[in-house]
Structures are given as C-alpha cells and as structure tokens.
Amino acid sequence: MTAILDTIESPCDLKGVTQRELAQLAAELREKIITVCARNGGHLAPSLGVVELTLALHRVFDSPADKIIWDVGHQAYAHKLLTGRRDRFATLRTLGGISGFPKRCESSHDAFDTGHTSTSISAALGFAVARDLRGERNKVVAVIGDGSMTGGLAYEGLNNAGHLNKDLVVVLNDNEMSIAENVGALSNFLNRTVTSEFVHTMKKDLEGFLGGLDRIGHGVLKVAKRAEESLKGLFTPGMLFEAFGFEYIGPIDGHDTARLMETFEKVKRFDDAVLIHVLTKKGRGYPPAEEKPALFHGVGPFELETGKVIKGKGGAASYTGVFGEAIRKIAAEDERVIALTAAMPDGTGLTPFAADYPTRFFDVGIAEQHGVTFAAGLAAEGYRPVFAVYSSFLQRAYDQVFHDVCLQNLPVTFAIDRAGVVGSDGPTHHGLFDLAYLRHLPNMVVMAPKDENELQHLLLTAIEHDGPAAVRYPRGNGYGVSLDQTCSVLPIGKGEILREGLDGALLAIGSTVYPAREAAEALAAEGIDLAVVNARFVKPLDRDLILSLARTTGRLIIVEENVIQGGFGTAVLELLEEEGINGVKVLRLGYPDRYVEQGEQHELRAQYGLDAPGITARVRTFMKG
C-alpha cells in the first residue's frame, strides 16, 4: 500500500502532511524502494538509510528554488520518488529509464549531476556564490556521507566554504561506516544539539559584545574559545568542522523526522556556513540490508522475502575473482607485491588477499589520488605495488599517474577493473576512456586480456615490468576457459594471430576479441576471409604484426571497448601515418564521442554495434564498400 505516496507529485505536497502521516510515508517509500531494487538491483542500503532525512529536507526547504545536492547520489531514491518520478521509478537503472543518480536533465529538483564521491560541498559552494552574486536568498544544502569525507576534495570544499563563510548548509550523513561514535556524557553535553535560533544569535551577540570591549574583551573571548575548543576537541568531531569555519550542530538522530525538521527550520534562518551532523543506519527498514549493509550498498536483483542475491547463469569465474586469486598466487612467490585499493576491497577482489597478507594490503579510503602516490612511494623503495581500481575512478588520480608514477618511471601496476561498459550505473561509472587517457603517457604500458586466463598472465607481466603498467579488464564473468595453475610473463608489445585471413584483418583488444572472432567466422561463411588478432597491447603496439597485415590485406578493422577518440584505433592510424603506409582502408569500431547511457552490458554493446552480430554487420558493409 502506498496511499500517501500516491498523492505526492512534488515536495510542495509534503507541506500538509501530518507527523503521523510522515511516518507512514516513510514506510511507503521504503516499501517502494525495496520492491524496485529487488527486481532491478541498485544502491539499496544507502537509500533506505536516508528516508526520514529526505522527507525532512523536502518538508522544510523549497526545492527546486532551494538547492539540494546529493554527494555521490546513490542515496537519492526517496528524493526521486518525492519529486515527480514515482510513476517511472520501476524503470530505475534500466535502458531508457530513470537514472540511479541525480541528473539535471531528468528533473529540476536534481540540482547537480553526481555519481562520484566528495563533490557536493565544492559544487554547493559554487551554487551559494552564484546566488549571492545575483542577490538572491535561496538556501543551498549539500548532503554528504561519512564515507565521502575520506576524499580530499570534501576538505578542499570545506576549507574554501568556511573561509568565504557563505550561507551554506552541509548535512553530514554519518551512517556508522567511517566516523566513530562520540564518547561519554561530557561529549554529549558539549555537543548537544543547537537548533535554537536564540542560542545561535546569543552566541553571535556575545562575541560582538566581548569584541567591543577592546583588549580585555578580546582576551576573554580568546580564553573562552580556547577552553571550548580544547574540551570539544578531546571528544567530538565538532572542533574539526568549526576549525574550517562552520557552525557545528549535532549529532542528531537521522531517523527522527520531527527533530530533523525542527533543526532545519532553525538553520534555515542562519546566514553563515553550518554543518549538521546526523546519525543514520544503512539499510534501515529491511533486515537483510541492516545486517549486511556492505552487501546491499550496491546490490543486484535479490529475493524480496529473504534478501538472497539472485545469481546469474553459468559457472564461469568473474574477472574480478580471477584477478584476486592471481595476485594471491603471485604474492606468495614475490614478497615485494603489495595490494592497494580505494575503499573497494570487495569490489576489486582483494578481500582474500587482505586476509592472507594483512601487512601487505592497504585500503586508502575514497582517496584515489593519495592511493596512486602512496603506491609510487612504495615502488620507489623497491616494492611492486598493485593499485586495484575501477576505470572510472582512476580518472580522479590522473595527475598522480602522470607526475608521481610515469614521470619517474616507477613500477606501479594499475589493475583496472570495470573497463568498458559496466551496466546500470551509467555514464559516471562506464570505463570507456582509460585506453585513451593512459596510452599517451610516456613510460606507460597498456594491456588488456582476451579472457580470464590471459588476465592472470598479463598481471604477472605488469608486475615484473620495470616501469608503470596498466591491465584493464571488464565487469562480469569470463568465458569459462580453463585457468593455468601458474602465471607466465608474456612478451610486451606482442599480439597473437587467432585466425589467418587474406581479405582483411580484425585487430581486437580485450573484451572485444571473442566477439570479433565470432564475427569473422560468420563472415567466412559468406566468403569474406578475415584474420583475427588478439592485440593484447595498446602500448606498445605490435608494430611488425600490424604493418604486415596492413600491407598484405589492405584492410584493417580495429575493435575496442573504449571511446574511438584517442584509443586503440587511433594508435593504429598513427602507426600507419608514421610508416608512410597509404591506401589501407581502416574501420574503427568503438564508442562515439558522447557519454553512454545506462543499460545492461549486452544491451549497450548491441546498441552500439560492438557485440558479435553488430561487428558482423558493420564489417560486412565495410568489406563490400
């Protein structure tokens, strides 16, 4: 039953809802979110944890005039349901459906697109300054989780915002994942909730009064502030945020709608920077998610009654799992190997490694920049660090890859998971740029395996290489090929011919190799005889092999699960130009110059012509042209 929710078309409709009805509405929101996530998958636990917070924000503030910016955005499902997207919520994270993250193009209530962490405070400050420049009076609210506070960008935003002292509200959603609990009765007393406008005004007036008493008043004010800060700093995070120039309020029960609304109503009258610390529970209202919040943080389809995740077909190992086992095998033979991750030990397959080698495993938090430079320092001291990271998140540390790793030619291995299209999380999470943004860095070796067995060999190849190396591999299961018991070093810059052919050559990299070979077999039945190459390396290229095929066949088809601009195909064109080879017809297959939408991996590959039937059709047209 969603009787109240069915009447909510916009946040304005919340104004007349009673406190009792708000409690019922919270239950209806949770029911809707759980039901849709059970079918579609999604970020269930974060969204369940902020239902009351979302209701209070939209009850008190006037979106879209007031701007609410959700950090990361995976906790915004209740927000979507309350802002006119209830009827489309069943399409969440599906091809053509609504996004799992805030999207400005989707609703005027989505003030800022998000998907990566720690961006909200900086963005909110931009909104606040723009408001002041226009002489307007609307409020700006950033909602950020404690996990996102491990990212340096959040503190850069806090530092600048506190310095400017703009009218800005930051809501710190502490869901017990990162920030420790406060200690003792004195702590509770010193950080009791300050929701009274009177108390806030009195403090300002007292500061003004003491400041006006010349030297004596200033002395008293300094002593009072030192005493307050010294005691508060012993027990609470309040001193930290006040040092940044924010008024600190909290902690507050994030599931007490009445208390939240009272606090927001009072803070709404303030005109300086305020941070409100709320305590919530991830997965609230769904026992399986409460018991295993990490599992249900981002989860696939699951059984509604039990919470059991529905497994896919077949028994092929995932690329992530193969990587995790391979690095354990390699580390057993090489004590120099150290594994690092940025808050993704499960997602990158490093949890077993952490159990086996706790002193050689480091989770740096949501801090990719730090992680890369940390790895560079380890490499400079003779270790062989492996930084396991999603392709999309490595983008956050590009300068560190350039300045701290490649410039010094340090042996850091980048194990780049989720390369290519990743599915329902959409454009913020697709890994479609790494081939392009890595291959032009001097000293960097860039490689991609055709299957899960080759992954473990390329991983060892990267670790043994005396310089920076990146191995990129897709999300999902492999092909079920047998896995060699030992890993071998492969010659760098050498591909392999999988099929001979005289009419042209398909040069494929990584996840496109198998569909390219399937396309070649289909075209052979039509009398089109194509060679198929597993390139393995985007940098350095197998120059001799590519040039030989260009000269003997006259037609090259390059296939990559990456943007076409600057990728593998571009590298081949540059090689042909450097060697002065003219008259070779080239077809580049990859993703176009746009941000690719959400959808299942197989749907997106079919839509962009990068599955076997799509490659077959496009190559057929090319060969007959």
From Swiss-Prot:
Mg(2+) binds at residues 146, 175. InterPro entries: Dxylulose-5-P_synthase, THDP-binding, Transketo_C/PFOR_II, Transketolase-like_Pyr-bd, Transketolase_BS, Transketolase_C, Transketolase_CS. One of its GO terms (biological process) is thiamine biosynthetic process. One of its GO terms (molecular function) is magnesium ion binding. Keywords: Isoprene biosynthesis, Magnesium, Metal-binding, Thiamine biosynthesis, Thiamine pyrophosphate, Transferase. It catalyses: D-glyceraldehyde 3-phosphate + pyruvate + H(+) = 1-deoxy-D-xylulose 5-phosphate + CO2. Pathway: Metabolic intermediate biosynthesis; 1-deoxy-D-xylulose 5-phosphate biosynthesis; 1-deoxy-D-xylulose 5-phosphate from D-glyceraldehyde 3-phosphate and pyruvate: step 1/1. Thiamine diphosphate binds at residues 74, 115-117, 147-148, 175, 286, 368. PANTHER family: 1-D-DEOXYXYLULOSE 5-PHOSPHATE SYNTHASE-RELATED (PTHR43322), 1-DEOXY-D-XYLULOSE-5-PHOSPHATE SYNTHASE, CHLOROPLASTIC (PTHR43322:SF5). This is 1-deoxy-D-xylulose-5-phosphate synthase 1.
